Amino acid sequence: LKKSLQIGGAYVGIIVGAGFASGQEIIQYFTSYGNKGILGALLATLWFAFVGMCIAQISSRLQTTSHKDLIYQISGNTIGFLMDFVLSLFLFGVSVIMFAGAGATFEQMFGLPVWLGSICMIALTMMTVMMNVKSIINIIAIATPYLLAVVTIIAVYSIATMDLSFAEQATIAEQQLQTSSKSWWVTALLYMSFNIGVCFSLLTVMCGAIRNERIAGMGGIIGGLLLGALILLIHFSLLAKMNVIVGVDIPMLALANEIHPIVGLLMSFSLLGMIYNTAVGMFYSFTVRFFKPTKPSFKVAVIFMGGLGFLASLVGFTTLVSKLYAVMGYVGFILVGSIIFAWLRGIRRVV
């Protein structure tokens, strides 16, 4: 059970980046649908748990060491090559966004120059990535219960002090916020498929190191359920205070500061922790795609890619990645379909 909880915690830790923890993603994909957002959250939870279990079990069975091992097995050479290319570019791109985001967060919190904040995050990420995969799982998993505790405090406070009823708040949410689709269930599935693309690479590496399929699969289920719990907690926190947070850039931080500056500080560190988690997960997955962690060239590659990531964070590389986000949603659907089909077939290692 301990191993399954670690996998589940790391699964959550990879997906819960700054956009999730700040509340922006939850507003866009769930809360803007009012009460139907609850149904969307429940639908996404079921799919996160099921697909997470499928990835974990197949990866454990094939003993994968990078996403390449699994993608070509489940998708064939042509589609596999395209998905491998998009995923690899996406992993590096999200890493760069996290480095740039850390710089902006450090500037806002401590008044440090943006470049210095980025370098601090890159250095911390590189040191972590040079550890073995089991240590990385443990580090990423640690932040999950901390975030869960902070979000629970905010949710209890928001509901206890709400000015309007949930029905009135839902009306405000539906009227004033733009939605990415008119259908709550399509948006929920889009959110799931995109995030499976985000976590897929590290999840295959993590679970490839687990020999027991049942333990790995249980980790995927636990992670999916924890994600659902976080989505619902943040959704209710935001919906309860919709009349207060409309137009706010970081709504969860605004609610935390409303409780007490100390809670606001805890939330700020939580956001930094989520940026760090995502940066480590993406950067490690990208590097192991091309270099084996056991070889000396791996550490050299980590340092080189870290330097490249820093330069990319300064020269507007993030505009390219924003376009990749849209592509990743569609690639995510193909990926999810391939994973489920492979799981149903009971795919085995090709010797």
Q: What are the residue ranges of the model-derived segments?
A:
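Membrane-interface interhelical connector segments
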Residues: E174-T179, L238-P261
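Hydrophobic, membrane-embedded alpha-helices of multi-pass small-molecule transporters
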Residues: K2-A21, G40, L87-L91, S95, ...
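Membrane-interface loop-to-helix entry segments
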Residues: A102-G103, P113-I119, T128-A160, V321-I339
